[in-house]
Curated annotation (Swiss-Prot):
Name of encoding gene: rpsB
Biased composition (Acidic residues): 229-244
Family, as annotated: Belongs to the universal ribosomal protein uS2 family.
Transmembrane regions: none
Organism the protein comes from: Desulfitobacterium hafniense (strain Y51)
Plastid found in the keyword field: no
InterPro entries tied to this protein: Ribosomal_uS2, Ribosomal_uS2_bac/mit/plastid, Ribosomal_uS2_CS, Ribosomal_uS2_flav_dom_sf
GO molecular function terms attached to this record: structural constituent of ribosome
Domain of life: Bacteria
Chain segments carrying region Disordered: 224-244
Name of this chain's protein: Small ribosomal subunit protein uS2
GO cellular component terms given for this protein: cytosolic small ribosomal subunit
Length: 244
């Protein structure tokens, strides 16, 4: 069965690119035509590229790999959080803090501080502190949760990035490239596809389009994880047979 259909892509408006004056010539190979001053993305290519991205991410997850979902623009925030949580992966959907990967140890210290504050609240420490101090601590905790909540359980650098709009997330893309972390991305007609390892040519401004494609990436991860679990169970069963 196909990973995604042309009908689904059309219904979600995946084919609508940017205005012709706002384009990157490197995206020409993914453009089908121009209509009313807007580029139309070649959905046959999108179908193939979604399949390529799906297989790549599924295999990565089957090998125990992790993916960091990145999408901080309004149209992507909700989908990125929901789909990353659904497949048990990490996400950044508010603001990419410079050095999130290239200065990972420092970011981990901020995550530790977030955990410390959460523990204080859970253990009732806030209840015995002065109101003014509690208000300041809560404010700090909420701010840390907002920016780092999606990577709270990420103990090491991810094995891949999934990015919605690499142009908007250029700092994340630059950090991943510097660290040789592969990038899968939803790439619109105004982006540079050369910076992305697995390009999904698509509209990155429509909520439905972003939701559809982000959901497929999450599906691939879940499928990979299930395959990994089944392989583990088969291995354990084989070991038991040998032991008998």
């Amino acid at each position: 069965m196909a990973v995604i259909s042309m009908k689904q892509l059309l219904e979600a408006g995946v084919h609508f690119g940017h205005q012709t004056r706002r384009w990157n010539p490197k995206m020409a190979r993914y453009i089908f035509t121009e209509r009313n001053g807007i580029y139309i993305i070649d959905l046959q290519k999108t179908v193939r590229k979604v399949e390529e991205a799906y297989n790549y991410v599924r295999n990565l997850a089957a090998d125990g790999g992790t993916v960091l979902f990145v999408g901080t623009k309004k149209q992507a925030q909700e989908s990125v959080k929901e789909e990353a949580e659904r497949c048990g992966m990490y996400y950044v959907n508010e603001r990419w803090l410079g050095g999130m990967m290239t200065n990972f140890q420092t970011i981990q210290k901020r995550v530790s501080r977030l955990r410390e504050l959460e523990k204080m609240e859970a253990e009732g420490v806030f209840e015995v502190l002065p109101k003014k101090e509690v208000a300041a601590l809560r404010h700090e905790m909420e701010k840390l949760e907002r920016f780092l909540g999606g990577i709270k359980s990420m103990k090491k650098l991810p094995d891949a990035l999934f990015v919605v709009d690499p142009r908007k997330e250029r700092i994340a893309v630059a950090e991943a490239r510097r660290l040789n972390i592969p990038i899968v991305g939803i790439v619109d007609t105004n982006c540079d596809p050369d910076e992305i390892d697995v390009v999904i040519p698509a509209n990155d401004d429509a909520i439905r389009a972003v939701k559809l494609l982000t959901g497929r990436i999450a599906d691939a991860i879940i499928e990979g994880q299930q395959g990994s679990d089944e392989a583990e169970e088969a291995e354990e069963a084989a070991e038991e047979v040998v032991a008998e």
